[in-house]
Regions:
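Catalytic center-proximal scaffold of phosphoryl-transfer enzymes
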Residues: 1-253
Length: 253
């Protein structure tokens, strides 16, 4: 399967935008009676939301831990937009010192929204509810333009989303100043504000997405099948200390 895997790896990396995420997986190592925790990483090429007719595809890789060197290795040939969560292991990918140049960081609005939503569910905070309402207005626009060409998506975002994002930022900065930084809502708002530029990148690029749900969906099959992953991960990487194109899970969408 190696030639097929290598071909898919090249195809997935040969694009302008990728979605990435990871999940823990228990690994039954040869000769040991107990399991260790490894990681499954996903890299998704899928531009259908921006009107692309290119086939989507997913490349998965296994690593024995969550160190940032693994995505660095996986993404060595990639140049472009990387949509991901705020995991610090990705930081060097966005550095100008990265070999081949820095990748463009795009954060996940859904991840940021989830933190605020969790606060609202537990506290029914009016401030959290208002934040969710404002974010839902942005998502309503994304629903309208899903599948349109990049240029049309960008035009709509500039005409409608830009002002909403500016208003949200001003409102959140003001309200965050009234909150304890140790409160759950204060932590959620600070999380959003600390990533603001990366969260808003999609406003200025019709190819980018507002969130990283594409990668999260790709990992669902792994999460549902973790019991079957013990032996699979053992087979994938019995002798390799790091994941590589020849030591991966892969599939198309």
């Amino acid at each position: 399967m190696t030639p097929l895997n290598d071909a898919l790896y090249r195809y997935v990396m040969n694009t302008r935008k990728l979605h990435t995420d990871d999940t823990p997986v228990k690994v039954l190592a040869p000769g040991l009676k107990k399991t260790k925790t490894g990681r499954i990483w996903t890299y998704v090429r899928d531009d259908r939301n921006a009107g692309s007719s290119s086939p989507p595809a997913v490349w998965f890789a296994y690593s024995p831990n969550r160190q940032g060197k693994h995505p660095e290795q996986h993404l060595r040939p990639f140049r472009g937009i990387l949509q991901a969560d705020a995991f610090t292991g990705y930081d060097r990918l966005f550095s100008a010192e990265r070999e081949g140049g820095a990748l463009t960081e795009v954060a996940c609005c859904a991840h940021a929204r989830r933190k605020i939503h969790d606060v609202y569910i537990s506290s029914k905070s009016a401030m959290a509810e208002e934040a969710l309402k404002r974010i839902s207005e942005l998502y309503a626009i994304e629903d309208e333009i899903r599948g349109l060409p990049e240029s049309e998506r960008l035009a709509v975002r500039q005409q409608r989303s830009k002002a909403l994002l500016t208003s949200l930022h001003e409102w959140m900065v003001e309200k965050n100043g009234t909150l304890s930084k140790k409160s759950r809502l204060g932590e959620a708002f600070s999380y959003v504000l600390n990533q603001w530029d990366a969260l808003c990148y999609y406003r200025d690029d019709g190819l980018a997405e507002a969130d990283n749900n594409t990668a999260e969906r790709a990992l669902r099959a792994v999460c549902l099948g973790k019991k079957n992953s013990y032996d699979l991960c053992q087979i994938l990487s019995p002798k390799r200390p790091y994941a590589a194109p020849g030591a991966s899970l892969y599939r198309g969408l």
